[in-house]
Amino acid sequence: MISFSSFYQQIADSNLQHWLETLPSILGKWQRDHKHGNLPKWEKVLNKLHYPAPDQVDFVDSVTVGSGEQLSPGEKEKLENLLRLFMPWRKGPFHIHGIHIDTEWRSDWKWDRVKQHISPLNNRTVLDVGCGSGYHMWRMLGAGAKRVVGIDPSPLFLCQFEAVKRLAGAHHPVHLLPLGIEELPPLDAFDTVFSMGVLYHRRSPIDHLLQLRDQLRTGGELVLETLVIDGDENAVLVPQDRYGKMNNVWFIPSVAALMLWLKKCDFTDIRCVDTDVTALAEQRRTDWMPNESLLEYLDPTDITKTIEGYPAPKRATIIAIKNQPNQETVNG
């Protein structure tokens, strides 16, 4: 069974220690709820990942574990077969003992767009909301973060993350907790909070922004990346049914509308640092994710539109600072 005890120990004397009042019981319930289904099968695979400590790791320019020289061809083949049992791999890529996990998303491209605009992560405690299998968490560690906590309720993402961590070394201060943000108390503790690719999946985007604010210390930095449309501060797309074949897309605002929402939620120093139309080369079908991808979500006769006729995915990165909340918002 995947254990979270080392995380509990690490936060016991930190500014996250009050989380221990509720977190163990919440994670215990999550484990009980998932004792059937795929999780036990994936945990058995994790228990087979007994390999020597890597001769090198790189989290600065990539997520690389091992040079590829430590394992024999047979050992490498066995490891690849085990890692393939966690398919589909969506966020990456990862380089594990010479094995290239070519994920659906080139998450390294997103990181390259974001990293130059954020405050330095040196010695920061970081929260990554909707972290997937944890690719960006490793890059945050490589950028100097003191501790990185990711939350994502998916059992598969947790097991993919655990696979990489067991191969990289359990001592790294990177932790994935299978939670949704609505299960977090107001911690007011993180120096930087990332929410990338989450907002449009939330039924109430304003509530999501308030939940993100509640995790930041005053003066802490929010890094928000989400789908946007063109338009003024009144422009918001609400898909009638599906967007890019996704049935869980609720609100896609313009950059101007999103910045207004953030201002209303008592963020300050709000700025848009990047907009980017998602390229077919950034999200695509691969050998490690053989299902439909972006190409199948777009109009085959006009890739500037989704298959439903909406504008094709365009993403913006907004950075904002948590201000001291005004009393009206607190009481609101």
UniProtKB/Swiss-Prot annotation:
Where, by residue number, does the polypeptide cross the bilayer?
A: none
Instruction: List the EC numbers from the record.
Output: 2.5.1.-
One GO biological-process annotation of the entry reads: tRNA wobble uridine modification
- The residues that hold carboxy-S-adenosyl-L-methionine are K91, W105, K110, G130, D152, P153, S154, I181, E182, M196, Y200, R315
Q: Which domain of life is it from?
A: Bacteria
Query: What keywords were assigned to this record?
Result: Transferase, tRNA processing
Reaction(s) the record says it catalyses:
carboxy-S-adenosyl-L-methionine + 5-hydroxyuridine(34) in tRNA = 5-carboxymethoxyuridine(34) in tRNA + S-adenosyl-L-homocysteine + H(+)
GO molecular-function term, one example from the UniProt record: transferase activity, transferring alkyl or aryl (other than methyl) groups
State the function annotated in the UniProt record.
Answer: Catalyzes carboxymethyl transfer from carboxy-S-adenosyl-L-methionine (Cx-SAM) to 5-hydroxyuridine (ho5U) to form 5-carboxymethoxyuridine (cmo5U) at position 34 in tRNAs.
Complexes and interactors: Homotetramer.
What family does the Swiss-Prot or TrEMBL record give for this protein?
Answer: Belongs to the class I-like SAM-binding methyltransferase superfamily. CmoB family.
The record's section on NCBIfam families has: PRK15068.1, tRNA 5-methoxyuridine(34)/uridine 5-oxyacetic acid(34) synthase CmoB
According to UniProt, the name of this protein is tRNA U34 carboxymethyltransferase
This chain's source organism reads Shewanella sp. (strain W3-18-1)
Output the lineage of the source organism.
Answer: Bacteria, Pseudomonadati, Pseudomonadota, Gammaproteobacteria, Alteromonadales
